[in-house]
Regions:
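Buried hydrophobic positions in well-ordered alpha/beta secondary-structure cores of metabolic enzymes
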Residues: 37, 126, 187-189
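Extracellular/luminal Protease-associated
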Residues: 95-137
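A contiguous pocket-lining binding segment that forms or flanks enzyme active sites
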Residues: 136-137, 143-191
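A hydrophobic, small-residue-rich beta->alpha segment in the mid-to-C-terminal subdomain
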Residues: 188-230
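Acidic/histidine-enriched, glycine/proline-rich intrinsically disordered or flexible terminal extensions
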Residues: 228-265
């Protein structure tokens, strides 16, 4: 008897992350997020080696819905496992049909890109269900379609080989490794043009606060360096530079004024 098909894979988390926090995180840069997480003692939260299949659909933030793969086995992972849904050998379909609005399907493909973790059909279905993104540390097929799909899809590369060649979906909504980073169900993933950062759920709201401030400060510092000022005394900012930043904000925060406005001594 199939005990998996039709099961509810949604998890009730102790820490709520408001939709407003998710929206704010979409505007936070990966550089600021990883720096602030490093200051909290989390030294590697960035998924190294992954890129968006469509560079125009790279920005997202959402809660992790995890999928774990193991190596395929020839007597189990045959074309017959793609029988009509539901069936116990096709948990990948279970994931796509259970993922919630605003969630990110995060796939542990063991960093193995030899066979596609998914093609364009599954991300298209996820988009229609309101999911936020799909992320794998493996590869995709249907690269030309994904390059046009207005839905964030991150992976290593494009290959044509079917998932069944090397991957079996073993479990859903369990802790996984993706691109060398631990991802737990409910963690918050943020993607921008540079890549993806994993934020422990309980730190999401704090990261939104810290990174908004950091990104604003970094933009100010880039105006000053771009105007010809040396790094020393500007970047990283000294107390005096931070005071100048506050004075610049109070004066209207115009980019052209950044090299000129200074705090009163």
């Amino acid at each position: 008897m199939d005990m998996t098909a039709g099961r509810n894979y949604q998890i009730k988390h102790e820490v709520e992350v408001p939709a407003s926090v998710i929206e704010r995180l979409k505007n936070c840069s990966s550089g600021s997020l990883t720096t602030e997480l490093f200051k909290k003692g989390l030294r590697q939260c960035f998924l190294v080696g992954l890129k968006p299949m469509n560079s125009n659909a790279a920005i997202f933030a959402g809660e992790a819905f995890t999928l774990r793969m193991i190596p395929a086995r020839e007597d189990l992972d045959t074309i017959e496992t793609l029988k009509p849904y539901p069936n116990p050998h096709n948990l990948q379909w279970e994931a796509v049909e259970n993922i919630g609005k605003g969630q990110v399907l995060v796939i542990d493909s063991r960093n193995d890109p030899r066979a596609a973790s998914a093609g364009a059909m599954l991300p298209t279905r996820m988009k229609m269900r309101g999911a936020a993104a799909i992320v794998t540390d493996g590869s995709f097929r249907d690269g030309q379609e994904l390059a046009k799909l207005e839905f964030p899809a991150y992976g290593q590369m494009v290959v044509a080989s079917t998932r069944l060649s090397y991957h079996r979906v073993a479990d859903l909504q369990v802790p996984i490794a993706c691109a060398g980073v631990a991802v737990y169900p409910g963690d918050i993933l943020v993607g921008d043009g540079d890549g993806i950062t994993v934020i422990p759920r309980h730190l999401a709201a704090e990261m939104a606060d810290l990174c908004e401030r950091r990104d604003e400060l970094e933009k100010y510092l880039s105006y000053r360096v771009g105007a010809g000022e040396p790094l020393y005394g500007v970047y990283p900012p000294t107390d005096a530079t931070r005071a100048d930043f506050a004075a610049w904000k109070a004066a209207g925060a115009k980019p052209e004024d950044a090299p000129h406005i200074r705090a009163e001594k």
